[in-house]
């Protein structure tokens, strides 16, 4: 069994979470001694582009396909559903040299990303034993923290610029994660970007 290290980038939009995650993935991949999973948990799919990967299928595509098959009664019980989900998720996983990428995608409907975030949480738990390091590029704000998507994270990296809004979002994320015990993390840190 692997002792997987999970690192999550969180913060306000536009502060450099995606760039930081991409640099971390590339640096670890260049070392070549770890099996890495990059998770593009931001619906804007920025990490995929930053890593130079064209994503054909996302977690949300799998979710929509699964919903359709359940409606059409093309799959049976819960075990059948889980087996199909497991198979489809490995189809979504893009292997790129020394790392793999999983993109959450952009839900088609209006409203919140609750269903796809819940699925993402289960996927992270399911896939973690197959990798040495998981790097998550989270969506902007506190949604994925509140929804416990990042329930088990070793290192919570709060990325911010020097603006009061960016620093406040980082502070709120840390408070929510700590005070509400929604993230079980070993360490947290603040990475300041765009310092002049």
What is each residue range found by the language model?
Residues 2-5, 32-34, 97, 130-132, ...:
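Short coil/turn connectors at secondary-structure junctions
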Residues 5-43:
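Walker A/P-loop phosphate-binding motif and the immediately C-terminal alpha-helix
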Residues 7, 37-39, 100-102, 155-157, ...:
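Hydrophobic/aromatic beta-strand patches that form the interior of the parallel beta-sheet core
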Residues 12, 41-42, 104-106, 138-139, ...:
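Fold-independent oxyanion-binding glycine-rich loops
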Residues 24, 46, 50, 169-173:
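Alpha-helical scaffold elements adjacent to nucleotide-binding pockets in ATP/GTP-utilizing enzyme cores
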Residues 30-96:
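N-terminal phosphate/diphosphate-binding loop that engages ATP/GTP or pyrophosphate donors
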Residues 81-96, 100-138:
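Cytosolic-facing regulatory segments adjacent to core modules
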Residues 115-196:
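Conserved catalytic-core segment of NTP-binding enzymes
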């Amino acid at each position: 069994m692997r002792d997987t290290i999970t690192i999550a980038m969180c913060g306000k939009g536009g502060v450099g979470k995606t760039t930081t995650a991409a640099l971390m993935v590339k640096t670890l991949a260049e070392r070549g001694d770890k099996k890495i999973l990059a998770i593009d948990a931001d619906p804007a799919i920025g990490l995929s582009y930053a890593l130079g990967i064209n994503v054909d299928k996302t977690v949300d595509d799998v979710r929509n396909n699964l919903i359709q098959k359940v409606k059409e009664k093309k799959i049976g019980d819960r075990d059948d559903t889980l087996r199909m989900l497991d198979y489809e998720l490995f189809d979504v996983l893009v292997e790129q040299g020394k790392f793999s990428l999983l993109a959450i995608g952009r839900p088609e409907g209006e409203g919140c990303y609750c269903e796809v975030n819940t699925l993402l949480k289960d996927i992270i738990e399911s896939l973690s034993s197959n990798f040495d390091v998981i790097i998550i590029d989270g969506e902007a704000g506190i949604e994925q923290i509140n929804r416990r998507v990042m329930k088990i994270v070793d290192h919570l990296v709060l990325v911010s610029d020097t603006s009061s809004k960016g620093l406040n979002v980082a502070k709120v994320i840390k408070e929510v994660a700590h005070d509400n015990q929604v993230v079980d993390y070993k360490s947290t840190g603040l990475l300041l970007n765009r310092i002049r």
